[in-house]
Structures are given as structure tokens and as C-alpha cells.
Amino acid sequence: MWLLALCLVGLAGAQRGGGGPGGGAPGGPGLGLGSLGEERFPVVNTAYGRVRGVRRELNNEILGPVVQFLGVPYATPPLGARRFQPPEAPASWPGVRNATTLPPACPQNLHGALPAIMLPVWFTDNLEAAATYVQNQSEDCLYLNLYVPTEDGPLTKKRDEATLNPPDTDIRDSGKKPVMLFLHGGSYMEGTGNMFDGSVLAAYGNVIVATLNYRLGVLGFLSTGDQAAKGNYGLLDQIQALRWLSENIAHFGGDPERITIFGSGAGASCVNLLILSHHSEGLFQKAIAQSGTAISSWSVNYQPLKYTRLLAAKVGCDREDSTEAVECLRRKSSRELVDQDVQPARYHIAFGPVVDGDVVPDDPEILMQQGEFLNYDMLIGVNQGEGLKFVEDSAESEDGVSASAFDFTVSNFVDNLYGYPEGKDVLRETIKFMYTDWADRDNGEMRRKTLLALFTDHQWVAPAVATAKLHADYQSPVYFYTFYHHCQAEGRPEWADAAHGDELPYVFGVPMVGATDLFPCNFSKNDVMLSAVVMTYWTNFAKTGDPNQPVPQDTKFIHTKPNRFEEVVWSKFNSKEKQYLHIGLKPRVRDNYRANKVAFWLELVPHLHNLHTELFTTTTRLPPYATRWPPRTPGPGTSGTRRPPPPATLPPESDIDLGPRAYDRFPGDSRDYSTELSVTVAVGASLLFLNILAFAALYYKRDRRQELRCRRLSPPGGSGSGVPGGGPLLPTAGRELPPEEELVSLQLKRGGGVGADPAEALRPACPPDYTLALRRAPDDVPLLAPGALTLLPSGLGPPPPPPPPSLHPFGPFPPPPPTATSHNNTLPHPHSTTRV
């Protein structure tokens, strides 16, 4: 009898396991959630082998258990010759791989000189706790962490009780669950996905949450501007992780057709860049950008070669040939490379995403204007006081900021972002005027408040609003929020608002399980309620693309007080009203967030910058850094002009500054001041005339852009674009060109003569967009090297042969004929180092 009973138990176990060690029938969809909930160490089949996870209980009675799969490889380790290369798919492994402990973090220098102003406040305020998450570092760091719920979360149960309807198949365990992949921030230099436990978000929202490690700093973003080191390896790691999820997440009960990427800070910038990249097309459907976009000054590196040369010089790899230099860098230890102090210009980055013509095909704002992100639903927002770390250094005491400190901070801000001598005075005084509370101008606390608003508006608010507007211009779904709450923590100034990164504990449900080492807050019931609200919005968006559906806001099971969010309907953002949701203890839907200040940065400041360029065309500007790796000896035939093209050589070795960037001084002013009065009158009259012309051009350009948008949205019948995302077609024989393309074609023909500048031939006749003009700087640098090769769409294997010359937005532009004074003419739009 006992033998019969044993056989029956074994048969029942085999049926419960689905006939295989992975918990799913061979060839079936994968592990059933019932098996996940019953086994302590469940095993799942993937395309590369079996992985064993661990079931964990959460410290909250309303949350069910979660199975964690920690350290699942999504790519081959980028070691040896694979350093500075796109990631490859992981190799298969025999047997069962344990996925029960966190993987190593990617190499980084947590105690380096990276400016704290760009890091989240919880990171800098708890640096010792953050260091414990990155003590175990290795170049073999390309791993995912998966958090899979084992039963329906409280949102599903609450919905069923409230509506008395049958369970919604979209959010029950009988259907595939939405997937949310989190991209961590840290200025592309620091951080790890291990810091973010997705268990509460997964259990409460009934979604699968994934975090990942991707290559950082020099190992993730070093670029020489040519095929020796193309850059953007960190972005390609994220794309490879998305490929892995699309291929394998069904085995864990996830839906590969409902993948949402979300991130904060630099992670949000990566979200924005992945939206614009054709490499990630079809790999995800929705995106959430928390406190970051691709058009902030710190989002994209427009001087990659400059910092690569500085690093190479520091470690003894300063070679004349870029390939030799990269090979030398490959032979160095990761620790030696990461520990080098290569300081970026303030408000910028030394190693980060670059416009390579492939992964990032063009300037992100140009791609947005072309409608390259039409296929994605988007949720984007900012925190009330993002710029806290910018102001703390200027706050001399609890009494606020003195008048002299205010003036110095604004001057330093203008110097670091714009750098030109005469025009900065006008811009500096204009900024001071706009951010002075004239009703209480002598109040130090008010000066501190307006200074905080200045940095928040410039670095976060204006770029976020511009991004949302560009998205909404094409009638694509976008929701905008502002976050107005932060937890009570020691060391936080009483005057501080919700700073950079303060939304993260609420997104990941930390208040529901209590304080952690990274978030040592005194969480109240209000914090728990607000966290439930945020998780409901975020997971609703992942399920349907609408944060209001399918689960209504209701937290009576958490808080005895009524939830004010129950009566709020989060409206879509549109280009006219610009509606947004105020997320705080007193929620409300409003419109036109900080409209005056946003218009100041997006409209007036670029206009002032353009006026300066026109007025001071006689100013000789120093040559910028090149974008290709050139020999250190200057080429023959180089001659100076009023507006010199980017040279083919770097300054002499003695001119390379290995320390923090310092802007070079311009030649002295040689104007004749004997007739100051007449010159002043003449300049004043000229300014008036130029203002009239500029504003007339502005209104004309707005009308013109609206007309072009209508043409993009309503193409002529029978003429498909043939370009993903609605990009422009190439002029081809036998096809009638639209007026704007015909104009560019005529310019190309007209500029093809001997001695013509190809860069001028490729430049559109219409004036540059004001928000693009805002990013002009004295050391403008075009980015795409003429010899750059495209990456394979899969990111695997050797590069393909060079494609034929093309102006396709996803391919490289044809290089100019080599000359002694040739420079990078490969982009149709100029790029710069300074952004909104």
C-alpha cells in the first residue's frame, strides 16, 4: 500500500509541475503561477537553460509572496575583446542555474569626484548604504533581476469586490502579466539595478518587475567617433535585455506584447533615447520617464572624443591611431580605467550616450520633431524641487542665499553653459531679472527659493514639457505629472521640496514594508496611501496605457481617511492646455505647468542667443575639439576664418587640460570707444530692427512647422513613406519632391562646386529651431564621424559592409572627400555641447 501511495504522490507532483523541471510543459508557455506559489525554490525553463528562483514573503499582510530570480544573465560577459563592443546573446548553460542572490554591479567609482548635483538625494544622503550595493563589482555584470507575483494582488481583489463583476482577464493570473523593466539612474556613471527591490510593486500591481545592470561610465559609453569605439554600449545593453525579455518572459508568466520601460534621472533619459532608436523597435510598447529626458544638458555627450583623449592620456594610451588607443585601453584593468578622474564641464557629462548615427541616429530633439516616437504611449513628469543639490552649496545659512551668492551662482551658471564673453552679460541679467521676486527682493529665503526654481526649470521642467509637447503634437498619448511630496528624513532641510529621486520609494512601494537602508524615512499612513496611489497609476499605465484604468484609486484598506485621488481623472497632456496631475496629499489636475518660465527657456533665451550671434559675428572663436581620432600634428592648409570649421586635429598635447574644464578666454576687445555715443545709438537702432525681424521670423516659422506637421500626419494618397516612424524619404528619380525636400536638393546641387563647404550645402535653408539654438555654444562639435559604421540591428556578430551613400535617418551619412582641411560634414544639423 505504501508503495502505491508513494507512486500517487509522485504522479500528483509531476502533474503539478507541468511535466518538466521548468514548471511548464515542454514547448508550452512556461511555468504556471500556481507552481511558483507552491514551491520554495521554483525552477523555470528559458531559451538558454533552467534557472532556480526563491519564493519570499513580504512584510505586509495585504501583499502575497513574490518569486525572485536574481542574477539571470541576459548577455555574454563583455570581457577581453568584447570590451567596447555591442553585447552578444548569452551562452547556454547545462543543468539548473541558481538565481537566488544578487549579481555583481558594473565597475564604478562611488567615492570619486563625480558632482553630487546630478545624483538623487537619497543616494548622496546615504552614500555608505549605497556603497554596500556596489562593493561586489565585476565587468561580468550583465544580469537581470525578475520579481514575479504568485497570486492576485490587492488591486485585483479590490476591483472584484467593488464592481461585483467577473475577474478582469487582463489582471488575473490566468492571463499573461504586464512586464515593467526599470532602468536605474546615476549620471551614467554610478548605480545598479540591485538597489531597487521590485517585490512590492510586483505584488501590489500584479505585474512582473525587472531591473538590470548595464555598463557604466568609460566601459559603457567611451567613444572615439569612429569604428574603433562607437560608444552607446550601455544603451545596447538595455536593448539586449529587452530582447531577452521578449524571448523569455512568457516562461515566467509575462506578456512580451506588454512591456513597459521606466526609469529615473539618467535612466529616464535612456528611456527617451530607446524610444527614438530603431534598434529597440517592437521590444516594448510604453515608457515612463521620471525626472529626465533626452534634451537636458546632461543627457547626451557632445564632446566624446575630448574626454576619451583625456582618459587615454591619463592611463598611458595616448596613441595617434584610434584603433591602437582602444586596444591599449582594452589591456588596462577595469579598475584603472574607472578610477581615473575625468571631470566633465558643469551641467554636462564626460561619458554618456552619443549621437552615433545608428543607435542614436540624430539629435534627440530633431528625431522627436520628425515623429520618431509615435508608436509609444508615454508618461513623463518632474519633481517640485529637482535642483536641491544645485542650491545647497549656495545656501550659506538657514537664512537663505545672500545677494552676492545669488549673483555669483547665476554668473557661474551662464559661464558654464554658454561661455561667450559679451552676450553672457545680457543673458545673466535677464535670468536674474526673471528669477527675482520683486515683491520681496531682499529676502534671502526667497532668493534661495527662486534659485532652486531656476535650476529645476532649466535642467528638468523645460526639457520635460518640451518633450511632452513634441509627443503630443503628433496626437500620441502622453500623460504629465508633477510630484509634490517627500518622506521625512534626517538631514533634509525644512525648506526642501520634493527633490531629484524623491518619487522612487513611492514607485517601488517602500512605505508599505517600512524604512530601508537607502530610504531611512519615518513613513506615515499618508506615505503608504500615496505609494499605493503611485503604484496604481504606474501599473495601470503598464496594463492599458491609461493610468486611470483598469483599477480605480481606492486605499480605504490602508487609510481610514478618504482617498482624494478617487475623484481625480488624470487627463491627457495636449499641446494647447498642457494638462498635468499634481501628485501630493492634495491632488488636482491643472494645466500649463510653470508656463512663463518654460517659455522663457524655450523661446526667449534661444532668441537672445541668436541675437548675440548676429551682433558679434566679428568675434574669433577658438576651434572646437574634433570628433574623429586625428594625428597630433596639424594638417597642412589650415587657415583661420571668422567661423572656422571643426579642424581635423586636436590642439597640441600641451594644450590638453587634464583637469576640470575651463573655458578659454577670447581675444581682447579692439573696438574703438572714442565714439561710444554714436555706436550706442547705432547698436540700439539695430537691436530694434533685429527684434522686429526675429519675431516676424518666429511667427512665420511656427506657421510653417504646423503646415509641415499636417503634411506628415496626412501624406498624399498612394505615397507611403517607407520610413519607420515617418522619417523623410530620399530624393529619388521619377518622384516629385515636396517643396522642403526640393529646396534641400537644390542646395546640394548648388553647393557641389569646387571649394564649396559641404556642411553649408547640407544645412536647411530655414532658420534653426529656437530650442535647438538654445544649445549652441562656442565649442560646437558635430558628432558622427565620417568613418562610422552602423551596428547590426541585433547587436551581434561583426559589422556589415558599409551601406551605399544615404541620407536615411537611421543610416550613416556619406563622408566628404578627404582633404587636408576636411572636417565632419556628415550630419544635416549642427550639434552642440549645451542643451536645455
UniProtKB/Swiss-Prot annotation:
Pfam families (alphabetical): COesterase
Annotated glycan sites: N98, N136, N522
Superkingdom: Eukaryota
Biased composition annotated in UniProt, kind: Pro residues: 796-819
GO BP annotations, alphabetical order: gephyrin clustering involved in postsynaptic density assembly; inhibitory synapse assembly; insulin metabolic process; jump response; locomotory exploration behavior; modulation of chemical synaptic transmission; neuromuscular process controlling balance; neuron cell-cell adhesion
InterPro entries: AB_hydrolase_fold, CarbesteraseB, Carboxylesterase_B_CS, Neuroligin/BSAL, Nlgn
Region (Disordered): 623-661, 711-735, 791-836
Gene Ontology MF term list: cell adhesion molecule binding; identical protein binding; neurexin family protein binding
This protein's GO CC annotations: axon; cell surface; dendrite; dendritic shaft; dopaminergic synapse; excitatory synapse; GABA-ergic synapse; glycinergic synapse
Extracellular side: 15-678
Topological domain spans for side Cytoplasmic: 700-836
Chain segments annotated as transmembrane: 679-699
Membrane-protein topology: Single-pass type I membrane protein
Comp. bias regions, Polar residues: 824-836
Result when mutating Y770A: Abolishes interaction with GPHN
Modified residues (Phosphoserine): S714, S719
Tagged with keyword Magnesium: no
Range of residues in the leader sequence: 1-14
Ranges of compositional bias, category Gly residues: 717-728
Protein's UniProt keywords contain Hydrolase: no
Subunit structure: Interacts with neurexins NRXN1, NRXN2 and NRXN3. Interaction with neurexins is mediated by heparan sulfate glycan modification on neurexin. Interacts (via its C-terminus) with DLG4/PSD-95 (via PDZ domain 3). Interacts with PATJ. Interacts with GPHN. Interacts with MDGA1 and MDGA2. Found in a complex with MAGI2 and IGSF9B, where it interacts with MAGI2 (via WW 1, WW 2 and PDZ 2 domains). Identified in a complex of 720 kDa composed of LHFPL4, NLGN2, GABRA1, GABRB2, GABRG2 and GABRB3. Interacts with LHFPL4; leading to mutual regulation of the protein level and synaptic clustering.
Protein name per the record: Neuroligin-2
Organism name: Rattus norvegicus
